[in-house]
Amino acid sequence: MAIQKILFASLLICSLIQSIHGAEKVRLFKELDKGALDVTTKPSREGPGVVLDAGKDTLNITWTLSSIGSKREAEFKIIKVKLCYAPPSQVDRPWRKTHDELFKDKTCPHKIIAKPYDKTLQSTTWTLERDIPTGTYFVRAYAVDAIGHEVAYGQSTDDAKKTNLFSVQAISGRHASLDIASICFSVFSVVALVVFFVNEKRKAKIEQSK
């Protein structure tokens, strides 16, 4: 009887969760107002083959209402600017996968800044955070409404996400002092091992002489 009550309660909870989830319309990236914002990025270092250093280099980012405008501009309350993975850095990495359902999309996990909407040109200079992984990136700005839902966006690259990309090298986490300490420890271990064997041989000879 107790088991039946538990099963019934579990089914009731599951159905309740499903009904709550179904009550909210699934929000899709393709339904956002595309190109509503003009977004540009200027890395602190540029040129062929240049790779930016996490924790050191900076991005100068600008955004403004695009020339084509947006029919949903009245809904814009906050602009959220994010660092996003470009396709080359998403290959074989499902945790970075692009998904049309915004709730499931993992393209832009790195928050840069959030500011109240202003149609005039806005800018920020952002230092690449120390925990940014090695990869190829672009910047996207979302226009968010009063209830926190994305309604429009603009990005620093084209629709195919192939232009105006930049590369970042992550901090390795290793320091010269650690490498020196590691070498010293290895040398000490070898010396200690040699001394140990020499002492053991000496003890063995003394025992034999007795």
Swiss-Prot record:
Signal peptide range in chain numbering: 1-22
An MF annotation (GO) of this entry: nitrate transmembrane transporter activity
Expression tissues: Highly expressed in roots. Detected in shoots.
Claim: S-adenosyl-L-methionine is one of the keywords in the record: no
Gene knockout outcome: No visible phenotype when grown under normal conditions. Reduced growth on low-nitrate media.
Description of what induces expression: Up-regulated in roots by nitrate. No effect in shoots. Induced by sudden N starvation and by low nitrate concentration.
Subcellular location: Cell membrane
Subunit and interaction comment: Heterotetramer composed of two NRT2.1 and two NRT3.1. Interacts with NRT2.1 and NRT2.3. Interacts with all other NRT2 transporters, including NRT2.5.
Protein name: High-affinity nitrate transporter 3.1
Species this chain originates from: Arabidopsis thaliana (Mouse-ear cress)
Gene transcribed to yield this protein: NRT3.1
